[in-house]
Amino acid sequence: MSYFGTDGIRGKFGELPITPDFILKLGYVTGLVLIENNQNSPRKPSVVIGKDTRLSGYVIEGALQAGFNAAGVDVYMLGPLPTPAIAHLTRSFNADAGVVISASHNPYYDNGIKFFSADGKKLTDAMQNAINDKLDAIMAVDGNNDAVMPILDPAQLGKNNRIDDAKGRYIEFCKGSFPYQYDLDHLTVVVDCANGAGYSVAPRVMRELGANVIAINNKPDGININADCGSTHPEGLQEAVLKYEADVGIALDGDGDRIVMVDEAGNLVDGDGILYVLATQGQTKVAGVVGTLMSNMGLELALKAADIEFTRAKVGDRYVMQELEANGWILGGEPSGHILCLDKSRTGDAIIASLQILAVMQARGKALSDLTEGFEVLPQKLVNVRLSQMQDPFEHEELVVAFDKARATLEGRGRLLIRQSGTEPMIRVMVESDDEIECDVMANDLADKIKAILG
């Protein structure tokens, strides 16, 4: 079976695959794959491990570390840091892989594992498949770990190292992405840290560049990550920007790879708006932009008017990355806030993306609301339909007929997208139309029909 979804391995803690026993085996077989891929190297393979602020992260961290060490792989423990920090530090430490313990924007009771290759990018399909195959083999042997996890001579075991300066290294990396000729003096910035991995580093980066920072949701307790805060719940940020009369608001998600922003008037600027500003007014001229199937048609039209090419990838930042590399472009992302600026970082990074927007504001002397003029969002309605178990809606004829009828209604003036989540039992229904009422009615009607049939 395939243990990997669109963004690593994810689930509810305590249920397969997110159990200590499974995670131990995952660390072990991943270690074996790294050893096989580095047979000609004179040194042991090494990995860096970071996490977000979930309580379950401590248990998973220990199990992963033990699995890697048992396979003969050295481990560098970085503690709570954003996902993009782990991608950067994987390269900085010359490690063979990076591992992030996080379920991103999900609630605290979920957790997951994401991997980076030695170059700080998402794992190749080939390496992911190799890990998956070894997991299949080890899970097939019931109740006898010694049969599938041979004990090494103690001299061959991996070592465990805790790194104290990882946070400082990442902060300097982020600051280095901001143009040296500008600073953030005289800017008041509200930062919603989602009680997640960026709770410490995000406000500090902004302060060290000169901003007056008001940090909210920056006191994680292990269970309040993403709880009515962060990029998936920006209402509190919008209120805070207005309350403190701030110049801009920035909201991260739980693992710090997604960002949405709020302008000085309290208006939300999602990933599409961020891409529009960076593509049309950013410091680096771009030939084209990669969005996804979820990107608003308004972004496509606005970029076309600016003579900038636009193409859509499948949903997921790994697919955006693949499309960017195929086209030789540097800018892409998703409405949810995964923003890839490949001239600055090799993965989606909320802090670095926000700094590029702040740089445009400072360079042009304009407010964020002024920078987003010219980008008109087409009415869009997104409804998430949670199911009791993962099911394919396209296997039910009644649903297929309903989808076809809706697409015919929208032809030439809107879009319908039906998509299964890659990480949880959920169907996403997205409707775009030049008629806002039609959007709401059609999306809700289709969602109700999916729920009634699939349960």
UniProtKB/Swiss-Prot annotation:
Name the enzyme's class: isomerase
What EC number(s) does the entry state? 5.4.2.10
Query: How is the protein altered post-translationally, as described in the entry?
Result: Activated by phosphorylation.
One cellular component term from this protein's GO annotations in UniProt:
cytosol
Phosphoserine occurs at which residues?
104
CDD domains membership: GlmM
PROSITE patterns linked: PGM_PMM
**Residues that bind Mg(2+), according to the entry?**
104, 253, 255, 257
InterPro entries named among the record's database cross-references: A-D-PHexomutase_a/b/a-I, A-D-PHexomutase_a/b/a-I/II/III, A-D-PHexomutase_a/b/a-II, A-D-PHexomutase_a/b/a-III, A-D-PHexomutase_C, A-D-PHexomutase_C_sf, A-D-PHexomutase_CS, Alpha-D-phosphohexomutase_SF
Per the record, the similarity remark reads: Belongs to the phosphohexose mutase family.
Can you name this protein? Phosphoglucosamine mutase
Taxonomic lineage: Bacteria, Pseudomonadati, Pseudomonadota, Gammaproteobacteria, Moraxellales
What's the name of its gene?
A: glmM
